[in-house]
Amino acid sequence: VFDWKIHTDLFICTIMEYKHFKKDGGIMRKTKIVCTIGPACDSKEMMRKMIDAGMNVARINMSHGVYDQLEVTIKNLKEAIAESGQNVAILLDTKGPEVRVGTFKDGSVELSEGAEFSLFKNKEEGDETGVSLSFPKLVDIFESEGQKAIGRELLLDDGIISLVVKSVNPESIVCTVNKGGVLKNRKSINIPGYFINMPYVSAQDRKDIEFGLNHGATVVAASFVRNHDDVRTLRDFIDSLGYEYVEIIAKIENQSGVDDMDAIIDYADGIMVARGDMGVEIPFIKLPEIQKTIIRKVVSRGKYVITATQMLESMTTAPRPTRAEISDVANAVYDGTSAVMLSAESAAGKYPIESVKALDAICSEAEENGEFTALHEYVEEHGMKDTNPIRSSICKAAKNIAQAVGAKAIIVESATGRVARAMVHYRPDCPVIAVATSQLVCRKLCLNWGVMAVMGEEKRTSDSITKQAMEKALSTGVVKKGDTVVVLSSNKTCPTSSTDSLNVRIL
């Protein structure tokens, strides 16, 4: 009898050992890993282990946790990053215009099919009779609709629990449990196909964003983006705080976001394919098509895209991923995703370190053996039109030359990160090593596919820039003496010079 469990475990063990060997041999994973920080991994020791296992970006989810607790977590994170000597970005994930249940006296309650359960404007502690709403005005909105609200379905906890509106009074929405289950504190409420008229950046979001940016976040994930105006509203607020350099990732997770995806991609710095709420708001059979479409469009415009939600969900309680999860992660890599994300697996699971290692191994294997011709052709045909034709021409030439000479890396001098991003837009076969002159730029490149950023010093001449770039590349371990590399640089003695020099060198 063929034991699938034994063979799956052997497969994962083998691929992890193989990846470790490849890493020592100088092969770099190009797909980045985002990990949500939570109770299972918020100590300095655990976060250091996650960095060593392959975490590139730490996600702080503002839907959970309080400021005092988060301050300690971020302090631990910064210490772990400093000790590791690696570049790890901090991503702040906003609540957005979401609706959640409040808290329960015992942390959770079991809802039985057919039982009555109410959603209150105000209720100190939830119990089997009902729970408070994070957006109390929803009661007023439903009451104003009268009979139109009766029979409406509410999906809780990503659709695990279903309620149907029975009646509405000034203080609560009275529901019948259509599909029961265990409902825990602060779980989401989705109303498929229903637009809730809420301000995009709430007062709580403003406080959360200011808190996160003051504590070192360099990217903000905007939840439940409905259209590009939401991105503009958030951009204006962040700029008003003096954080113009902070980047915005728009989370597309509802039908209105899908409908306006082209404009949202244009206005945002990156996109997250947030499959959890999307799978509740939109028929789940549409998810694969939407995921592939979003990834293609984002990559072709030279931006980064994160594929998120339930990537390795079973590893919340199990030490090995399922075969379906392995295929899901690999297919996201084949689609061209810039990054993959862990949520509960790292934040609240039993095996956060093993989850990171599994992602690291699966992504590396998929990158090495995947077929990316269709993606490259799409990017060539539909790719962005760079406002700097010299930069785009040199980057495109660098990719072709690197492929022709079998270069082990493309080394770029990138003071702002723009050249490195322009370079990976063309998806070269070899990694891109970006030599930056600020830690901020290094952190901002943490989400970009195929880029390893290292700190360098400000140099003036092409020769000194090239020499430093080659030395820094050697220090990464990605390349070694005798390897062929392609080097992009500029001459700082010329005030109008951009990246204008391309060299093929042997280290």
Locate predicted features.
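Short, Lys/Arg-enriched N-terminal segments with co-localized hydrophobic residues
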Residues: V1-I27
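Non-catalytic helical/linker scaffolds that mediate oligomerization, partner binding
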Residues: K19-L507
